[in-house]
Amino acid sequence: MTRLSGYLLPTEKEAPADAEAISHKLMVRAGLVRQVGSGLWTWLPAGWRVHQRVTAIVREEIDAIGGQEMLMPVIQPAELWRRSGRYEIEELFKLEDRRGADLVLAG
């Protein structure tokens, strides 16, 4: 672990053994992200700053063409996913609310 300009930078000398994608290897070695489980990632301080900068650039470009940003809920009605044909995906996390309505974790 290194401190660079007051930021925690937990770099790794070796790429994770299970890493297949070059981007995965590089981001872990650079101390940008840490995998905490299958498909679960933690943004480390330097990585979160990069994420915020990229988001700002995308936001500027959207504004420049007159676009509008929106935010959708992470938990969505399953009907949206059924209509798009994506509801039957095996890995999709499905749940039910207290009234029995089908929902999907859209994350």
Would you name each region that the model predicts?
Residues 1-107:
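TRNA-recognition modules of translation machinery and tRNA-sensing kinases, especially anticodon-binding
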